[in-house]
Amino acid sequence: MYSNLPVIPIVIPLLFASITIFFKNNTFIQKQITLCASILVTISAIFNIFKIKKHEILILEMGDWKSPFGITLALDGLNSILVLTSAIVFLATIIYSSKTIDKYSENSFFYTGILLIMTGINGAFTTGDIFNLFVFYEILLMASYLLLLVGIKKEQLKSSISYVLMNVFAGSLFVISVGYLYTIVGSLNMAYISKTISSLPDKRGLYLVGLVMIFVFAMKGAIFPLFTWMNRAYAAPPIAVSIIFAALLTKVGLYSIIRTYSLFYYESNTIKYFLLSLGTISIIVGCIGAIYQKNLKQIVIFNIIISLGIMVAATSVLNSKAIKGVILYSINDILLKAALFTMVGIIIYICKVKNIKKCGLINKYPLLGWTFFITTLCLSGVPPLSGFYGKALIIQGFVEDKQIFVGVIVTLSGLIVFYSLIKVFLNIFYDNTNKSLELKPLPKILIIPVLSLLVIAIVVGLCSNLLEPLLEKSTSTILNSNKYIELVLQKG
């Protein structure tokens, strides 16, 4: 279906970001503008979901330039789900930041950066051509550089160097691979590329480009062995920034892998086993890091690596159960990782500790403690909570593809996730032997985003049968590239 709806989640934050610049010295107005933009994007994303349930895919050809020559925005089940989930996380983050970001950081274009990174993320999810995927990557990266330096502490400056260098290198490789792809196909429209390459007699050059692209997306998604930059970059900035980085930025890399692999490289066993290997090793490395880490932020970061590894490995097998599982698992993971990082921020705010210490918070803050415990169960994949259903489908997908070893690794990773987070729970919340620790009072507004994210994640898991029609459409569009090609090139 032809529609202007796909551009709305991109235009709203971009427009509101430009408005915040005129109120540089009034952070209260900036905050209200950002909150308003986030609410509007959430509403538009919900509306888009209902439209896609009817029409399967929404197409917008910018300037009425026809595919494959013009800029195309294509919103289907997968990216509409990601746009909505991202909007919810942004909304929760803005509420959380209202009490945790200091005035100096707020005056450093914090809210402008939030809106620009929202623009880049939504654009990367929605674009239908490979070059504008690069453009939106650059928008979100420029915004992330700004947010990474909010407050300008020494630790942030150090972490920003590796982050910027990594992205400059990845961006250069991406441009080179896009240019080479254009010389082969003669277009940058994803649907047209997919249609054209299926008839190419010699695909070796194409698969080489594919490996480079997967390498770039793996670097941006922090997949093994390209995740080392993440430990500093995600831990250094204020928690409000880390929430967005941890929950969303890596998912843009994952989405790019899913989209390009399913459209361009699904016939290549080389790329399949390359992805499967990267994903499996990422799970193992993430598990090792999560076990041995004592720093609260680093424990969450290594848990992110585990979940990314699971989703990348599942994407490689490209069957119905695995892809459906990845979509459901990604919704759960985005919401719960955001909730987990928010709770880590609250713990640091209350106790002024960065490592696991005996704080005994359960007596004074029981709601926070039990929310952390339930989040731990969800992320571990304990049935019937939200993390179970997506992971169960992923394991079934591995079994169907005869990747039993990987399925076992994914199953065992749930135990490691549980262990890594329960040690935080037992020490931070239950052990109260440290009597000398002074606890700051907790502003009640900080618990609202945590509870909201957790409740939404649990509802999504328990009511996943209600999402079945949308999940089926999303999976069908990914697995049946001909359907996506037909809908995009014929304008729905």
Which ranges hold each PLM region?
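Transmembrane helix-loop-helix hairpins at membrane boundaries of multipass inner-membrane proteins
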Residues: 1-7, 15, 19-112, 191-195, ...
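Alpha-helical transmembrane segments
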Residues: 14, 35-42, 112-119, 211-213, ...
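Alpha-helical transmembrane segments and their helix-start/interface "positive-inside/aromatic belt" motifs
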Residues: 28-38, 158-168, 365-369, 444-452
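Hydrophobic alpha-helical membrane-insertion segments
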Residues: 35-49, 168-176, 452-466
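Hydrophobic transmembrane alpha-helices and their helix-loop junctions in integral membrane proteins
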Residues: 92-102, 108, 118-133, 144-392, ...
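Cytoplasmic juxtamembrane regions at transmembrane-helix boundaries
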Residues: 98-113, 247, 437-446
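Short phosphate-coordinating micro-motif centered on Lys-Gly-acidic
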Residues: 138
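Cytoplasmic/organellar membrane-interface segments at the starts of transmembrane helices
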Residues: 365-367, 414, 418-492
